[in-house]
Amino acid sequence: LSLVGSEMCIRDSTVVGAEALIRWRKEDGSLWSPGKFIPLFEKNGMISTLDEYIFREVCRQQEVWEKEGKKMFPVSVNISRASLYFGDIVDKYKGILEQYTLDSRYIELEITESATINNSEIASLIEKFHEAGFHVLLDDFGNGYSSLASLNVMHFDTLKLDKSLIDYIGDKNGETLLYYITRLAQTLGLTITAEGVETKEQVEFIHKLQCTDIQGFYFSKPLPLLEFIEFISHQKEDSQQESLVM
C-alpha cells in the first residue's frame, strides 16, 4: 500500500491543506484505484484497520515535517462509514494523535455525505470529535441524498462541494444552485471547499462565490508523497512568478 498526497486546497495561490489518499501498488509498479480494492477491505471487515493505518501514517508524516521546521498545514483523512460504528474511534484517534504529540488542527477528518444518511448517531459523534479538538469535514456534498436540514443537526466545520456540483458551472440553473448552496453554507458559518475543479472557468466562478478553498486537477493531480513534498517546496517560488488563482 502506498500513501499518496492528494489534490491541494489552494487559497490566494498558497497551499493551505491536503487530503491523504491511499493507492495499492501492484508488483509491476502500477496502481489500483480505491474503487477496486476498498470494496475488498469492506467485505472482509478490514476497512477500519485501513482507516487507522492512513490516520497513523499522516500523523507520523506531520510529526516529521514539524520536527524539520517545515510550514505546517492541515491534512485531511477520510473515515469510512464502517469505522463510524466503532464506539471507541474518537478515543483511539485522539490517542494516536497524542502519541505523535501533534496539535489536532493539523489533522482533519472527512465523513462522506452518504455516511450521514439515516444515521442519528453521527451528530453525537461529530461533537465528540470536536471535543477532542478535531475539525470535521462533510465530503462529497451534493452527491448523495441527505437533507439540507442535516446541516443544522450535524455541526460540520467544512462543506466540500462534490465535483458533480462544480460541473454545473456554465449552466445557468446549475450556477444558481451553487450560488445558494454556498450562501447557505456561509450563513451557517461553514468553510467551503470546491472539489474536482478542472478549468479556469470553474476557478473564476468559484472565486466570485467567495468560496474559501479550491481542490482539483486545475492545480495538481494527486501526487505521491515525495512529489507532493517537492511541489510544496517550489510552490511559493512558482506562485510569485504566476498567480494560480484569479
Region locations from a protein language model:
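The catalytic core of metal-dependent phosphodiesterases that act on cyclic dinucleotides
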Residues: 94-169, 184, 188-222
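Catalytic core of bacterial c-di-GMP phosphodiesterases, primarily the EAL and HD-GYP domains
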Residues: 14-19, 46-122, 196
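A short, well-structured catalytic beta-strand-centered motif of the EAL phosphodiesterase domain
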Residues: 6-38, 58
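Nucleotide second-messenger and two-component phosphorelay signaling modules
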Residues: 27, 64-71, 99-103, 131, ...
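The cytosolic transmitter module of two-component sensor histidine kinases
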Residues: 34, 51, 89, 93, ...
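C-terminal helical cap(s) of enzyme catalytic domains, especially alpha/beta-barrels
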Residues: 207, 223-246
